[in-house]
């Protein structure tokens, strides 16, 4: 009987810990890239750096605050209703994909030049930047 009570208490404690971490801790304890010093670069230069040498670009940009300036190619929404921007040159093999951190509407239009600050998380076919905030 003691064994069953111990297992139930352990499962309840584990569930409570998971709930706290998922819904409370992770909402309040996250990185504030806007307060960090950032690397300032154009969208074209950033995507070119990753195309030229991905390892070298990762050592310079990966998990760092980056302030990117470039032309907006598209504006979309992701599954979490966050605005996503694609910046760079039309027809280029690789561009910069930015997910904005807030759900506020964007006033800029496709074709306009914009500066966004966020955290570079690497490159797939495009360079990925998360937690972006329009400057």
Q: Where is each model-derived feature located?
A:
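OB-fold and OB-like single-stranded nucleic-acid-recognition modules
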Residues: 2-135
């Amino acid at each position: 009987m003691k064994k069953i009570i111990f297992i139930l208490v352990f499962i309840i404690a584990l569930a409570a810990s998971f709930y706290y971490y998922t819904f409370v801790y992770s909402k309040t304890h996250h990185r504030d890239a806007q307060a960090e010093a950032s690397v300032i670069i154009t969208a074209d230069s950033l995507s070119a750096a990753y195309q030229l040498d991905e390892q070298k670009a990762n050592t310079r940009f990966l998990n760092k605050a980056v302030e990117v300036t470039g032309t907006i190619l598209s504006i979309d929404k992701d599954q979490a209703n966050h605005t996503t921007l694609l910046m760079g040159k039309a027809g280029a093999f690789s561009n910069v994909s930015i997910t904005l951190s807030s759900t506020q509407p964007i006033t800029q239009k496709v074709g306009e030049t914009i500066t966004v600050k966020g955290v570079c998380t690497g490159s797939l076919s495009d360079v990925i930047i998360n937690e972006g905030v329009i400057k």
